[in-house]
Amino acid sequence: MSVTLALPSKGRLKEKTLAVLEKAGYKVVLPDDDRNYRARVEGEDDLDILFLSASEIARKLGYGSVDLGVTGEDLVRETLAHADERVAIEAQLGFGHADVVVAVPEVWRDVTTMADLDDVAADFRQRHGRRLRIATKYWRLTQQFFSQKHGIQVYRIVESLGATEGAPAAGSADMIVDITSTGSTLRANRLKVLEDGIILRSQACLVSARRSHTSRRVEEIAARIRAGLEI
């Protein structure tokens, strides 16, 4: 029975993933046609490669329709409810680093922690006649961090369809939860990260579907990739 490994379909994530695999002894033979999203691995007839977007890889791992995949931990934990029951992180690959953070306008000088934000949220409705609005693409992680971890309940998530960091300046939100690598885009939009506002430090990971976790072949592939990372 073959094993399906889903890889990012484009960009630096794809390039770096292919390099990690080659270091582990898995040379991916790319198709001649860029529209062909399947590939093979030299000398590994039972290992199928499938190229997908990083978000689709997270979904398919959750469904169990692929055995292994490379995607960001942020996408795994945002896309899948009860992620740890559905997938296992086999290895952190050392690239694609980014943090999911809570950021507020720099002019909120007295707001530096989540406790400060709790105070702001509590009286925001009284002052403004509405709940604190948070623009984000990460609604699951936001709810878990605000409601479950910090007990903040009085807020409203505004779905972000464009550049999340521009939402406060545009007036569509009061603050944001977004992903950042260097913080430069946040600073350019006059936003600051709260001192304890890092929700998740994410990076590209090798992830297995729990359905496939007992497969000896899946574990062998994961072990070889882990060993390659140590070279």
From Swiss-Prot:
Keywords: Amino-acid biosynthesis, ATP-binding, Cytoplasm, Glycosyltransferase, Histidine biosynthesis, Nucleotide-binding, Transferase. CDD domains: PBP2_HisGL3. Pathway: Amino-acid biosynthesis; L-histidine biosynthesis; L-histidine from 5-phospho-alpha-D-ribose 1-diphosphate: step 1/9. Its main location: cytoplasm. Its EC number is 2.4.2.17. GO terms for biological process: L-histidine biosynthetic process. Gene3D superfamilies: Periplasmic binding protein-like II. The keyword Transferase applies. It is found in: Cytoplasm. Heteromultimer composed of HisG and HisZ subunits. Lacks the C-terminal regulatory region which is replaced by HisZ. Belongs to the ATP phosphoribosyltransferase family. Short subfamily. This is ATP phosphoribosyltransferase. The gene is hisG.
